[in-house]
Curated annotation (Swiss-Prot):
NCBIfam families: PRK04966.1. InterPro entries: UPF0270, YehU-like_sf. Coiled coil: none annotated. Belongs to the UPF0270 family. Signal peptide: none annotated. Pfam families: UPF0270. HAMAP family: UPF0270. It comes from Citrobacter koseri (strain ATCC BAA-895 / CDC 4225-83 / SGSC4696). It comes from the Bacteria. This is UPF0270 protein CKO_04772.
């Protein structure tokens, strides 16, 4: 189920994004990016619709994923 990120408090959204970024551990190439930069990137992706916030009833978890990968 998709969660409208706009309905979350900014603190909750920031905490979810930070948790996601720390969990992902993605390699950003030659230049490591700060946590703040990674959080800002994910927030921008949510704002422009490239990424969505998703609740998994099966796993009872929240995740962030590319919009094109989301299947209801």
């Amino acid at each position: 189920m998709m969660i409208p990120w706009q309905e979350l408090s900014s603190e909750t959204l920031d905490n979810l994004i930070e948790s996601f970024v720390l969990r992902e551990g993605t390699d950003y190439g030659e230049h490591e990016r700060s946590l703040e930069q990674k959080v800002a990137d994910v927030k921008r992706q949510l704002q422009c619709g490239e990424a969505v916030l998703v609740w998994s009833e099966l796993h009872e978890t929240v995740n962030i994923m590319p919009r094109e990968q989301f299947r209801e």
